């Protein structure tokens, strides 16, 4: 069963443009209601969270209309991080959770992603079935069975309390000055609250959302803002979250940025030493640096690679019983604590290491020397397929032959935008640059 609406992380697009319209959100809500309703006529429960985009109000109301029309009761959480929706779906015994967010994308985009009753994102098959219902006739509930909607005032507070329980109970953050950049997004209140309540001196950044400024020069895709604040305030470290707080970058006291690979390396080594790393493996995507793989091998650990997307990381982790995984982009998945990437809880794990190690953040973040990596994006026309062109495949083959096992080449389509991502790694930076530029030129010509 194919999927056209759903990408690698739910349904996403420009607000008020297909598929991110009120009409489509209403149909998605109704289709999800039909898909998740158990047998019988009893009402069922849905939790809906959102980030701080202006279009979130429109999509929230449309989804609510669709869901209640099929007999689902809707609990509205307001602005909360994506991982909070996963957690609250499970803790509130909901049949489905929905997050309205386009994550790290600009404010003019938005998205809708679904969580099952276990708090995990839906499988490809489940999304395809919902999509099939969207395309057909959706039978509404009888008038007496229409659902209700209710705002939940303490949804954020429940998540804050849960997040604190993931930090070692015998430790406090007193004496640590921490910058936290919330990207004017979903964690703009939750993240500073958690850090302050654990004892840190908190320097908040990106905590004034206005509906239009989410991810605007801030957050995990712009960690330089957090780095400047760390240096300006003489902070011990910085935390740079994205718009829905499922990604994080760490900034050390020198203003140096550690990506998801470095964070995962630290946690894997630390957990392995503590006997907590299940299966002796870390799950990451094909985008993770070759240096991470070599770092793990040097410690008798394995790197299990998946397709790009934290959902695929989670699927591998659940299928094989691993408890640590993530992406270079900053999704850190710890299934002992969360059902999806959780930037705040990952930060707390880093802070726990910082607190009990007696080291500075700069000593913790540089776990391995990355192999030089270069990534470039090439936009292509909708409907075009540059990767199918013989000229592009020939250029990729030439690049692989030139690297001759000393590096790697990865070319893929983005799952959320009409982009071809051209990535390569090589010890020789001149060769690396030439290889990527040659492939980019071939893709641009075919696009």
From Swiss-Prot:
<dbReference type="InterPro" id="IPR006352">
    <property type="entry name" value="GlmM_bact"/>
</dbReference>
<feature type="active site" description="Phosphoserine intermediate">
    <location>
        <position position="103"/>
    </location>
</feature>
<protein>
    <recommendedName>
        <fullName>Phosphoglucosamine mutase</fullName>
        <ecNumber>5.4.2.10</ecNumber>
    </recommendedName>
</protein>
<feature type="binding site">
    <location>
        <position position="246"/>
    </location>
    <ligand>
        <name>Mg(2+)</name>
    </ligand>
</feature>
<dbReference type="InterPro" id="IPR005843">
    <property type="entry name" value="A-D-PHexomutase_C"/>
</dbReference>
<dbReference type="GO" id="GO:0005829">
    <property type="term" value="C:cytosol"/>
</dbReference>
<dbReference type="GO" id="GO:0006048">
    <property type="term" value="P:UDP-N-acetylglucosamine biosynthetic process"/>
</dbReference>
<feature type="binding site">
    <location>
        <position position="244"/>
    </location>
    <ligand>
        <name>Mg(2+)</name>
    </ligand>
</feature>
<dbReference type="InterPro" id="IPR005844">
    <property type="entry name" value="A-D-PHexomutase_a/b/a-I"/>
</dbReference>
<dbReference type="GO" id="GO:0000287">
    <property type="term" value="F:magnesium ion binding"/>
</dbReference>
<dbReference type="InterPro" id="IPR005841">
    <property type="entry name" value="Alpha-D-phosphohexomutase_SF"/>
</dbReference>
<dbReference type="GO" id="GO:0004615">
    <property type="term" value="F:phosphomannomutase activity"/>
</dbReference>
<dbReference type="InterPro" id="IPR016066">
    <property type="entry name" value="A-D-PHexomutase_CS"/>
</dbReference>
<dbReference type="Pfam" id="PF02878">
    <property type="entry name" value="PGM_PMM_I"/>
</dbReference>
<feature type="binding site" description="via phosphate group">
    <location>
        <position position="103"/>
    </location>
    <ligand>
        <name>Mg(2+)</name>
    </ligand>
</feature>
<keyword id="KW-0597">Phosphoprotein</keyword>
<dbReference type="GO" id="GO:0009252">
    <property type="term" value="P:peptidoglycan biosynthetic process"/>
</dbReference>
<dbReference type="GO" id="GO:0008966">
    <property type="term" value="F:phosphoglucosamine mutase activity"/>
</dbReference>
<dbReference type="InterPro" id="IPR005845">
    <property type="entry name" value="A-D-PHexomutase_a/b/a-II"/>
</dbReference>
<feature type="binding site">
    <location>
        <position position="242"/>
    </location>
    <ligand>
        <name>Mg(2+)</name>
    </ligand>
</feature>
<keyword id="KW-0479">Metal-binding</keyword>
<feature type="modified residue" description="Phosphoserine">
    <location>
        <position position="103"/>
    </location>
</feature>
<dbReference type="Pfam" id="PF02880">
    <property type="entry name" value="PGM_PMM_III"/>
</dbReference>
<dbReference type="Pfam" id="PF00408">
    <property type="entry name" value="PGM_PMM_IV"/>
</dbReference>
<dbReference type="GO" id="GO:0005975">
    <property type="term" value="P:carbohydrate metabolic process"/>
</dbReference>
<keyword id="KW-0413">Isomerase</keyword>
<comment type="function">
    <text>Catalyzes the conversion of glucosamine-6-phosphate to glucosamine-1-phosphate.</text>
</comment>
<dbReference type="Pfam" id="PF02879">
    <property type="entry name" value="PGM_PMM_II"/>
</dbReference>
<dbReference type="InterPro" id="IPR005846">
    <property type="entry name" value="A-D-PHexomutase_a/b/a-III"/>
</dbReference>
<dbReference type="InterPro" id="IPR036900">
    <property type="entry name" value="A-D-PHexomutase_C_sf"/>
</dbReference>
<dbReference type="InterPro" id="IPR050060">
    <property type="entry name" value="Phosphoglucosamine_mutase"/>
</dbReference>
<comment type="similarity">
    <text>Belongs to the phosphohexose mutase family.</text>
</comment>
<dbReference type="InterPro" id="IPR016055">
    <property type="entry name" value="A-D-PHexomutase_a/b/a-I/II/III"/>
</dbReference>
<keyword id="KW-0460">Magnesium</keyword>
